[in-house]
């Protein structure tokens, strides 16, 4: 028998306070940046490095005041948090966003804000100043992520560093969930690690970590807000102010964040009213304050201005002349137009992972076909999450393996609080008509995690082992999907950098495309674009760039 020459047990059983400190620091730093940026907008003050410095000091100070934790745990948490923050900014800055929306209106908004546009007091951006001659999304979409990213752009001089908030909130969720499972639910380390991997290796989060898309942010913030909420109303922990901060960011990252956050708070209010009346006044006060600040103040440039100018807070996805239906149907396969929401969900999650569009229908997947699974893996070499089998190449098989876990949950009486939690999560899914699309309802993974976690703690050892085995397979499935996406990102970046490098410190004749953000790539590489077109020249697209439409003049040999 192999003997391990070192005993890790004392280290594994140490208090988990430092995990909480790390999580809170990583969560607070970008969140305070967002709040201070909005404060600067209201006051008409130019945003700059001072916001980041103040946010850093406040975040460090707050983690020492939250709970009666050992000073050493807070110092450790702060030190690790600083390293992870620097690492996130550095890594994000090394990769260009290759996605469609990320290079389009997301970077448009970040550039405009960094150049001084104040979305509270300034006039809306005219269509002529936006990529694709469409400023609707820049003017009317929630602006929390753009506020933080514009500040990071000003701080580093590299717009790509703004993507680091994907890592920061994702890592915050990982440490927060690890602490929650260990400190609140007394999960063993093996159960904790597998369940945290199950939740965190989301194809939404990791599939968008190299882009400015906000669906992954929505998922991380949803999870963070949910944990703070459970801590507050069930475990009676002093997380009221943290959940307010989480709500502020959640509802201003994406419109659906407001809807999902509202559903979670409604469920929490009903629980407190029925089971924790001593918390009722405090809970309602915290929730009301969160809504007023989140929608009326931080959300002023979005929800209030949309209502005043367009008659609906959620314009352009709702209200007069809205684009909601069109946006939702962009990713519809041919066979989805006549299906209801449940039929679309079933079709999407049992389909072969294949390319679909308005001319190509989903195809029901033959299960447990090893060759088919292997052949479908390259499909995930794309922006995540994909629409068909979004969890990975053998998602269909995992749904079959999930059936025993679901049935064991149903036949066994569960605690009331578990039914309430499931009901709230299901409600947050059902309220989204397009919950078949994992991008729009990423919390589906959290719902599955609750069933798995319950089975892990089943009184039968074999049921617990089966849940661990299922979690392991799910993690492998996620890794296969995400690794393909990362490969796609790395290859595109390699090709683009390979082409831009020889052009550094030179003037290059270019044909401008429709995405304005590509010009920034040229300028950050010290390339001076010359827009005088040569009708006799041959212009070729930049390698690794599939969307912007920019071309350069190829030198004649």
Give short role names for the model-derived ranges:
Residues 12, 76-85, 236-247, 256, ...:
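Signature aromatic-anchored transmembrane alpha helix within multi-pass, membrane-resident enzymes
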Residues 469-530:
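Membrane-embedded, lumen/periplasm-facing catalytic core of multi-pass transferases
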Residues 1-73:
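Membrane-embedded, hydrophobic transmembrane alpha-helices
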Residues 88-178, 211:
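Active-site lumenal/periplasmic loops and adjacent helix-entry segments of GT-C-fold
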Residues 185, 225-240:
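Membrane-interface transmembrane helices that cradle and orient dolichyl/undecaprenyl
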Residues 53-54, 111, 214-222, 250-253, ...:
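Hydrophobic/aromatic-rich transmembrane helices and adjacent perimembrane loops
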Residues 31-35, 59-67, 151, 161-185, ...:
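Transmembrane-helix motifs of polytopic, lipid-linked glycan transferases
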Residues 114, 118, 122-124, 144-154, ...:
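Lumenal/periplasmic acceptor-binding loop at the mouth of the active site in multi-pass
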């Amino acid at each position: 028998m192999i003997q391990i020459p070192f005993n890790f047990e004392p280290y594994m059983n140490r208090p988990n306070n430092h995990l909480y400190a790390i999580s809170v620091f990583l969560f607070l730093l970008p969140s305070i940046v967002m709040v201070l940026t909005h404060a600067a907008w209201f006051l008409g003050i130019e945003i700059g490095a001072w916001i980041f410095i103040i946010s850093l000091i406040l975040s460090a100070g707050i983690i020492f005041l939250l709970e009666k934790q050992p000073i050493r745990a807070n110092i450790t948490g702060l030190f690790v948090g600083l390293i992870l923050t620097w690492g996130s900014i550095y890594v994000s800055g090394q990769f260009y966003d290759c996605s469609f929306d990320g290079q389009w209106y997301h970077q448009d908004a970040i550039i405009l804000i960094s150049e001084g546009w104040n979305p509270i007091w300034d006039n809306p951006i005219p269509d002529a100043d936006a990529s694709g001659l469409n400023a609707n999304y820049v003017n009317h979409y929630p602006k929390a992520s753009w506020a933080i990213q514009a500040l990071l752009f000003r701080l580093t001089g590299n717009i790509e560093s703004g993507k680091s908030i994907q890592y920061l909130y994702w890592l915050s969720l990982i440490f927060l969930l690890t602490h929650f499972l260990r400190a609140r639910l007394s999960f063993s380390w093996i159960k904790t690690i597998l369940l945290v991997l199950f939740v965190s290796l989301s194809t939404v989060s990791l599939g968008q970590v190299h882009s400015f898309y906000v669906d992954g942010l929505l998922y991380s913030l949803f999870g963070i807000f949910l944990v703070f909420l459970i801590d507050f109303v069930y475990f009676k922990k002093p997380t009221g102010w943290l959940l307010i901060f989480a709500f502020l960011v959640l509802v201003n990252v994406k419109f659906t964040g407001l809807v999902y956050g509202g559903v979670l708070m409604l469920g929490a209010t009903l629980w407190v009213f029925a089971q924790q009346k001593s918390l009722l006044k405090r809970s309602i006060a915290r929730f009301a304050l969160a809504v007023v600040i989140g929608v009326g103040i931080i959300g002023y440039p979005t929800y209030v201005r949309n209502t005043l100018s367009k008659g609906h807070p959620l314009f352009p996805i709702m209200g007069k002349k809205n684009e909601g239906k069109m946006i939702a149907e962009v990713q519809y396969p041919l066979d989805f137009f006549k299906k209801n929401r449940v039929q679309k969900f079933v079709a999407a999650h049992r389909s072969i992972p294949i390319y679909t569009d308005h001319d190509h229908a989903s195809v029901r997947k033959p299960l447990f076909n090893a060759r088919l699974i292997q052949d479908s893996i390259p499909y995930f070499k794309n922006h995540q999450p994909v629409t068909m089998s979004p969890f990975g190449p053998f998602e269909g098989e995992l749904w079959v393996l999930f059936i025993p876990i679901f049935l064991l949950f149903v036949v066994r009486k569960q605690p009331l609080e578990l039914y309430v939690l499931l009901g709230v999560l299901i409600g947050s899914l059902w309220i989204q008509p397009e919950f078949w699309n994992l991008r729009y309802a990423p919390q589906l993974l959290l719902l599955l995690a609750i069933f798995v976690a319950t089975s892990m703690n089943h009184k039968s050892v074999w049921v617990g082992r089966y849940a661990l085995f299922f979690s392991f397979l799910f993690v492998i499935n996620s890794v296969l999907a995400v690794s393909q996406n990362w490969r796609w990102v790395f290859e595109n970046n390699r090709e683009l950098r390979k082409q831009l490098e020889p052009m550094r410190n030179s003037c290059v004749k270019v044909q401008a495309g429709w995405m304005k953000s590509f010009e920034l790539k040229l300028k950050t590489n010290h390339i001076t674009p010359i827009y005088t077109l040569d009708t006799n020249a041959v212009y070729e697209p930049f390698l690794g760039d599939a969307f912007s439409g920019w071309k350069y003049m190829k030198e004649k040999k």
